[in-house]
Amino acid sequence: MYEGAVQELIDELGRLPGVGPKSAQRLAFHILEADPQDMKRLVEAITTVKERVKFCTVCGNVTEQELCNICRDPRRDPSIICVVEESKDVLAVERTRSFRGRYHVLGGAINPIAGVGPEQLRIRELLTRLNDGAIQEIIIATDPNLEGEATATYLARMLKSIGITVTRLASGLPVGGDLEYADEVTLGRAFEGRRNALS
């Protein structure tokens, strides 16, 4: 264990997702040894992203404007909405070039152990989007893990009464995996083979 500022930096870096104690230590020492100008640019980039980036008022994706570039794009099919957990999942789906509709970012998944229920997600906003009658299909593209499956089942049951086609990505994605780590071919095939979410 280190003392003072070094340990504080290691502790803070260790709070980042996917960064364990050893990685936090390596990052901290890289920062200590790096060129001060490089670190200044890093700090400025972090500050800038926290100041400028917000969430799209329609879909919840990250953007620097009121609407994200996908919601602003008139070439996107507004009748199909792909529901994902996080903004990083939008990028994963976009890499496939298989989907030309629009998105809805929930901001997470149902996880009772972590205290995340449907009311903490952007489900009300999704229902509001369905009110105009233009949406014909909802594709549920949550992660194929316990939380993602719980969220998909909840959404499918809730949307069934509305009379909109609700589909779920096909198998091919590893159970327990994260959507953002799927390769383009696997994710593309999952889109092509999507199925009714209640079957």
Curated annotation (Swiss-Prot):
**GO BP terms in the entry:** DNA recombination; DNA repair
**CDD domains membership:** TOPRIM_recR (cd01025)
Query: Is DNA repair one of the keywords?
Result: yes
Q: Name one GO molecular function term.
A: zinc ion binding
Q: Which domain of life is it from?
A: Bacteria
Known function: May play a role in DNA repair. It seems to be involved in an RecBC-independent recombinational process of DNA repair. It may act with RecF and RecO.
Protein family (similarity comment): Belongs to the RecR family.
Entry-linked HAMAP family: RecR
User: What's this protein's name?
Assistant: Recombination protein RecR
